[in-house]
A protein has these predicted regions:
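Charge-rich, low-complexity N-terminal segments
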Residues: 1-48
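Short amphipathic alpha-helical segments that mediate assembly, nucleic-acid/protein binding
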Residues: 9-13, 58, 102, 106, ...
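N-terminal segment of the canonical double-stranded RNA-binding domain
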Residues: 22, 34-117
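Ampiphathic alpha-helical segments that act as solvent-exposed interaction surfaces
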Residues: 108-141
Length: 141
């Protein structure tokens, strides 16, 4: 399974829905067995009538940001500090083509090596950090 075909965590999916990322909403009886989240907790009296959304994959989210001019990329590198595993360096870039100038804003961040944040080599944790940064960047533009 590719890293890009893995599903993002439910809390990040809810943040992206609030951020206006379009997501597949299930109609009554249309559930297809893929990971989902409800807009209400099961304990809520409105749970039975709430909306249910399919949780997107990392690839879905990265493609959506790309369609908005925000590009998320990952570079893989090998490091002995991570017990001979690979680690990831992520970059988020914005290209504004609304006028003749192309503007590029980039941040790069190396995966944490100390085990507290990401334990190194974690595509999921790096991708979540990159997506959250892209959300902040989109709010600024």
């Amino acid at each position: 399974m590719s890293n890009y075909s893995k599903y993002i965590p439910e809390d990040l999916a809810k943040e992206l829905l609030e951020f206006w990322m379009p997501m597949h909403r299930y109609d009554l009886g249309s559930y297809d067995g893929k990971p989902y989240f409800d807009t209400e907790d099961k304990e809520s009296p409105d749970w039975e009538s709430c909306d249910r959304y399919r949780i997107p994959t990392y690839g879905d989210v990265i493609d959506w940001f790309s369609s908005k001019g925000i590009h998320i990329t990952f570079d893989v590198f090998f490091t002995f500090a991570l017990a001979d595993n690979v680690a990831y360096l992520w970059k988020v870039s914005y290209i504004d083509e609304s006028n003749d100038d192309i503007k590029l804003v980039t941040i790069s961040e190396e995966d944490a090596l100390d085990g507290k944040e990401g334990c190194g080599g974690s595509f999921e944790l790096d991708a979540q950090s990159a997506i959250r940064y892209a959300m902040k960047l989109k709010n600024l533009i």
